[in-house]
């Protein structure tokens, strides 16, 4: 019996021209598109895709996850999304679940895929350009100056940054806005402030490049990536 397939599609960081050919072809072939939506209705990944793919006639599912620490609420939202996706897959409709950057890096797809597979459906990842690679290009920086140089990807929480700051090599702090003031303080304390740079909304029309954290305003985009050397 035929079944639909769930594709976790990496949309890249923001520039539609950074969508891979495979990502474009996969999205074109899927009648259903699931895309993250913020609380104020913005769908960044979908807007990126619209710059490269004609979505006319496709069903669009907004994916909403509240920024809550309530475990039960998060589990309920997760289960609701799985049910909605499975309903389409069971009707033999392939679904492209859009993920900013790459679907293996802090992505909704990797949290959803095991439950979809457990229900007997395929879930396949379509790689995308990771945001931190585009950030490195925007900064004109080498993330690994030596072949033996370590590279660390760190979520933007206070405790995560404090733990990682002493590690050797380059640290990439994703979603750096989550605790920016605390991160700045930690970097000053550890003597790493002058070696840190930040890019907001990389690849989007609103992109901002900050060579010094002194220039970064307290309020800014959630999509901020910091590079600490």
Feature map (PLM): residue ranges:
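Class I S-adenosyl-L-methionine
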Residues: 1-16, 21-122, 210, 215-216, ...
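A contiguous loop/helix-start segment that scaffolds small-molecule binding in enzyme catalytic cores
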Residues: 6, 95, 165-229
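Short beta->alpha connector loops
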Residues: 13-16, 39-40, 156-159, 177-179
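Residue-level detector of structured alpha->beta connecting loops
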Residues: 31, 93, 140, 168-169
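Structural signal for conserved beta-strand scaffold positions within catalytic alpha/beta enzyme cores
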Residues: 35, 61-64, 125, 145, ...
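Short gly/pro/ser/thr-enriched loop/turn and capping motifs at secondary-structure boundaries
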Residues: 40-42, 68, 130-133, 180, ...
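Short beta->alpha linker loops
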Residues: 44, 100-101, 127-130, 156, ...
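Class I SAM-dependent methyltransferase SAM-binding "motif I" and its flanking Rossmann-like core
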Residues: 104-167, 217
């Amino acid at each position: 019996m035929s079944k639909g397939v769930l594709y976790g599609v990496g949309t890249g960081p923001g520039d539609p021209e950074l969508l891979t050919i495979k990502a474009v072809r996969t999205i074109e072939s899927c009648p259903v598109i699931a895309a993250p939506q913020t609380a104020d209705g913005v769908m960044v990944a979908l807007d990126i895709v619209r710059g490269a793919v004609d979505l006319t006639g496709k069903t669009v599912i907004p994916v909403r996850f509240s920024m809550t620490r309530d475990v039960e609420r998060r589990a309920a939202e997760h289960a609701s999304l799985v049910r909605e996706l499975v309903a389409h897959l069971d009707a033999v409709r392939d679904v492209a679940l859009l993920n900013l950057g790459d679907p293996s890096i802090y992505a909704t797809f990797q949290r959803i895929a095991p439950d979809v597979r457990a229900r007997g459906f395929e879930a396949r990842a379509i790689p995308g350009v990771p945001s931190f690679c585009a950030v490195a290009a925007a900064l004109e920086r080498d993330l690994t100056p030596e072949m033996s140089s370590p590279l660390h990807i760190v979520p933007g929480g206070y405790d995560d940054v404090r733990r990682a700051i002493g590690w050797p090599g380059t640290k990439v702090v994703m979603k750096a806005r989550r605790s920016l003031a605390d991160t700045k303080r930690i970097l000053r304390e550890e003597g790493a402030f002058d070696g840190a740079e930040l890019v907001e909304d990389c690849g989007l029309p609103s992109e901002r490049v900050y060579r010094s954290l002194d220039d970064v305003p307290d309020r800014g985009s959630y999509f901020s990536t910091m590079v600490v050397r």
